[in-house]
Structure formats: C-alpha cells, structure tokens
Amino acid sequence: YGERIHHFAWSTSPDYRYEAGLHRDIPIHVLFRPGDLDWDLGAVVARSARALEWLEGVFGPYPYPQLTNLHRIEGGGTEFPMLVMDGGPGQGLILHEFAHQYAHGILGNNEWKDAWLDEGMASFLGNWFAEDVHGVEPWRGTMTGLGRVEAQGLPVPVATPSHEMPDYGTYGLLAYSKPSAILFMLREHLGAETMRRGLQLYYERHAFQHVVEDDLRQVLEEASGEDLGWFFQQWFHTTATLDYAVASASTERDGDGWSTSVTVTRTGEAWMPLTVEVGGERVVLEERARTQTVEITTAERPEAVVLDPDVVLLDTDRGNNRQALGG
C-alpha cells in the first residue's frame, strides 16, 4: 500500500522466487523466475539497497514504505512508484530504474513533453553512481561519442516533445544520452556538491508535484547563485554545437621557466568555459570570443597544449584539442 501514487503496475506468477532485505527500515522485495541464478543469493537485494542508499544521498530520504524489484520477461526496465521491473540484475540498470523513483515517481514530469527530465536525469545519475561508487569514468566515452554525433547534426533540440521526435533513434539520443551529457557538463561547471545541493532542493521543494524544466533550473540557480538561463536555452532548446581548437601554440624560455602562448578558436554557436592545460598548469577561458590568446607559465618545458583535458565538454572534434610543442 502507498499514497501519492500516480501510476501503477503489477506482476503475478506462481513460479516467482522471493528474497528480501532492508535499507534502513524500508523493506526491499526481490522477485525472480526459477533459473535466474544471477538474481539469487542476495545479489540483487544488495544492489537494490546500495542504489537506494546512494540516491537518498543525492535527493533525500525515500518516502515510500517499500520498494519491489522484479525480473521482467523482456530486457530493459520499467519504473513505477514502489516497483521497478528490471530485465537484468546489473547494478547500472538497477540504479537507473531506482532513480526513476525520484525522477518521475516523486518529481512527476510529463514524459510526452519533457522526457529528458526523467530519462536523461536517470541516465546522468547512473553514470554519476558508477563514477562515485565504482571509480570508473563513463563520461569520457560518452562525451567523445556524442561529440561525433553532434558533428553530424541532430534534427531537433533535446526539449522537443516526444511525439514530435522524427524517429526512435533520435528519441533515444535526445531523451537519454545527450541530456545525460548536458547534466554532466552542468555538474562540472557548478561543482558536484553544488549540483547535489540543487537536486536536494529540487526534491524538498517539488516532491509529489508535477515538475517542468524551469523548476529544475530555478533550484540549481538558487544553489549556485548563478543565472543558468543561457545554459538551459543553449543546450536544451537549440541544436547549437561547439568546437574548440588550438589554432597556434608556441613556447619559449622566460627566466627560470617557460612561457607558452596559445591561441584558441571556437566554431559553432554554443559556448562553454574552456580549460586550457599546458605542462600541468591550467587556465579557464571565460570569454565568449571566437578567438582568444592566453599566456601560461610553467617551470619545465611543456610537451603539449590540451584543451578540455578532463573531457567534460560536448566538443564535436577532439582531434584539434591537442597540439604538441616541438623543440
């Protein structure tokens, strides 16, 4: 039994196997079919508890009286308040579907109008969890791969209503992959703790309400003290692309150290602050100019100039982000 439930489902079978556990005082129920060996021996119970614990650390306390995780017949996953149906026992899928308890279950966006608000958010949280808990960096491949897709051009913006997407492949990119990458860029721009503070405020202020994009933007602005209208407009409401490039770079002796001059160009209509790294020293370029030149001093002779060294931008061509300094 639960209250403030906006949609529901059920699944029945006389053959289900059952395991149970607790997160705090919240019962976790796991149902799976005979022969689903990867689901038993407490494995999925433990992964479910781990996912719920982490998500509470991002948003706040889970408000429902229980959570059920069952093995669905098909692959993938489906989410409902207090119930997720997972096509497999993997931690990543479990985290994604559990994330929907918050992003869509408790914070109820309209999936026809703003699919990215829950699917993109859940995908973002899945990658953040993998980074935070498992020490992996899923973002690097995501940003590089999406940058290549961006270079080919996407037909519509992320904020396009689901029924207006031209095909299912585009829907997958714009509801899941690209908004996940955009939210990662935003987290890196604001800082992880500011992002977390904003999501906690999102939950505190809008739990069990219908939410829209502006609700998310406003709490992140409040948490950061920064106007984010430019960011949301640029990345969610246009198809603008971004490509930073090293136009030229040279280095020379400067007293006891080395002075390196770097000229950077920007093509495409999008803009983000850019980190330039030379010999371990970093400078952030905040201007929106098409061409910028920066001088960076290092103690040792640097080997190369690298733009966006942490791979946090949706850059359409990473091949021009690095230039060796000969000599």
Predicted regions and their residues:
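Hydrophobic helix-coil surface modules that form long, contiguous segments used
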Residues: 1-95, 124-127
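Second-shell loop/turn segments in exported
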Residues: 34-42, 85, 111-112, 169-172, ...
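Hydrophobic (often cysteine-bearing) scaffold residues that line and stabilize catalytic clefts
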Residues: 40-51, 91, 95, 114, ...
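Zinc-dependent metallopeptidase catalytic helix centered on the HExxH motif
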Residues: 83-141, 199-200
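Acidic/His/Gly-enriched intrinsically disordered linker/tail segments
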Residues: 115, 119-185, 189-190, 207
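Amphipathic alpha-helical substructures
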Residues: 165, 170-257
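Beta-strand-rich binding/interaction modules
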Residues: 228-229, 242-245, 249-309
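Short acidic/polar inter-strand loop motif in beta-rich domains
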Residues: 309-320
